[in-house]
Amino acid sequence: YGDHRDLHVRSRRQRQMCIRDRCLAVRTSIGMMDASTLGKIDVQGADAREFLSRVYTNAWMKLAPGSCRYGLMCNEKGMIIDDGVSTCIDDNHFIMTTTTGGAASVYSTLEMWLQTEWSELDVHLSSVTDQYSTVAVVGPNARHLMKLLCQDIDFERENFKFMQWRPGTVSGVNARIMRISFSGELAYEINIEANYGRYIWDQVLLAGKQWNITPYGTESMHVLRAEKGFIIVGQDTDGSMTPSDVNMDWILAKTKPFSYIGQRSFSISALNSNERLQLVGLLTKDQLVVLPEGSHIINNKGKSVGYVTSSYYSPILGRSIALAQLKSGLSQIGQIVLVKIVQEKRGLKEIPCEVSSSVFYDIEGEKVDGNE
């Protein structure tokens, strides 16, 4: 593969500086990311809406063509197994996205339900993960850049709203452009046929030079989403977490005519106990201390009552932040807890942290509309 010694950072400090620069570029100007790895499932048929309403916890029957919606998927026990955004192409056609690691298992699970339990539904599934490339354009200046790249779409805020999509032509290539965001910033995801992926990437990079566009990767993305309190299934959940455990009661439909997978399990008393682990934020008293992920939260008897799921230094906030699962966590917001960590050459140490909301940045969600 040749000599690529100059293409990687040489120290932990260099790595952290790179992440910082990329996060700040996204928050203050514009960044771009290859989001092609997300799973994609094409859902078609007269009962496509009904199918989505059964596999997701929220409602899909009234989602208009041209719109997108975030969905949470549970198993029969009511535990979160995946999440993603699905796009309504027309009344009988949707494109579902899944987590990168969950693409194959979600597709297999959906086929199992369709073939063994709901064979009466007119629905056809196709895995299209490899058929599309996705370039995410993210940051306050994203709208300005998209106007340069695509002249046949009206990108004004009132005409292209958050969680909508539009067909258009980007640098001469047919594309579906979704206005969705995993950073909390104004963002557009350009979806094109896979063989045009590199070409569109280069065109976006070239057009964005006037705003010092900065490519960023998974590590920076993790920081950005944690600042907004967005979960990653499999990192902030562990197969035993319900939507309520991660503060997402709002995504549980109350009036669906047909129950969705996992709905009946939510009536089990054990899943409604205040003693369950709940998603919270942690703010270290020493703002420069970044808690190791997996560290245990201990009570005054030294027993574990939770653990750190995600932990980063936030460049925009100038301090460390962490997400954690804490027993009865929501009732402890504002209180001080201890996190036990292992320090190299120093042994065990207990770090005092304040329990906080899991949303650290732009709590009101104003940044998603970007600059005028």
Where are these regions (language model features)?
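Single conserved hydrophobic/aromatic residue that forms the stacking wall/gate
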Residues: Y1-R15, I19
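Short, solvent-exposed secondary-structure boundary motifs
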Residues: G2, C23, G71-M79, R166-S171
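Short loop/turn microsegments at loop-to-beta-strand junctions
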Residues: D6-L7, R69, P292-G294
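Conserved, structured C-terminal
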Residues: R13, I89-E372
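Acidic, proline/glycine-enriched N-terminal capping motif
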Residues: R13-Q16, R20-G71, M79
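Short beta-strand/turn micro-motifs at beta-sheet edges
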Residues: R27, D83-G84, M178
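Well-ordered mid-protein domain cores that form the structural environment of catalytic cofactors
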Residues: N58-W113
